[in-house]
């Protein structure tokens, strides 16, 4: 472990993810922050996160986080405190104050905001206003996954909440973590007109850590039969899918010739996880919570079963594994849209919510293990989004440094003004 006793001249970058549901926002920002910390050796990346489990993923030297009070998304635009018994207004005030003070003290040269331009409840607005008033104003970037919701739903919500005006006023660039040829995020969500010059399609943000070969991991897991890995991402909404999968294994019986590993994710409720463990008794099935080497588990599989969340699906496609995808039925159209698009390209197989039953799943498990017609190779599928995002941020940091050479901060008693 490294320790740093001097203040130094670190390049400061801040990221924000509300993390009101799942790990997708946190995973993207963590991956980009890790790449940036390696590419810019003097950088410090401070992540503002809301995940109830903390940072979850390994952080390299140069990356740290501040945990905001946890909230949970109950419906589109509806958020509630998750753990503290202090009421909605106090939770809002505490998050706003924590963010604002972190921004003031850390004094970032770049801010990367994932998914929600003004934060939940508009909690980023005071900090965005403060940053824009600085004479050495940082680069402010909005990062968006490829598919947010049905276009009409997102457009209506953004119009209602003043999101377009906030993007116009505060954001210098918009990173799209996807491919325009596969899904035109800009056109779908009204960002292709006056905002077109800010848009950068960077490809998919996938974990860049090394992973073990299929043979090595299977030996480590002592697997001799066909292996099915069932993963639920963060796990907050994975129980219904995993319960159906467990029932499908019961349909197949203990002599199916399959070995199955469930990775529930750290956000699944404990009672739900224990119920799965009870059902797994007598089957060739293991139920795990969270594994650091998630990619190696997926790579060891003959078939991966997952939902259609951003991280799980794109890691699956990056590994070029057979994947049976069970998209979440709602509340947004994100997962069903993504599953349909990638099934049409021959990259995954899909069981749609209306088709879901233990018998249907059992048939799919066995059929997909024997199929040889997928996944197809798709040359447009670029998984270097984290590197491209880090490269773009590094370019902006260099430009900011050059433009700030005439600036110095005079620190006196109670004085933190910027002079040119």
Task: Describe the role of every protein-language-model region.
Residues 100-169:
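Conserved nucleotide-sugar donor-interacting segment of glycosyltransferase catalytic cores
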Residues 144-239, 270:
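A nucleotide-sugar donor-handling region in carbohydrate enzymes
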Residues 17-30, 239-240:
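A short, glycine/small-residue-rich beta-strand->loop->alpha-helix junction that serves as a flexible
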Residues 292-337:
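A donor-sugar binding/catalytic signature common to diverse glycosyltransferases
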Residues 204-303, 336, 354:
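Donor-nucleotide binding loops and adjacent catalytic segments primarily
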Residues 363, 368-420:
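C-terminal amphipathic helix plus adjacent low-complexity
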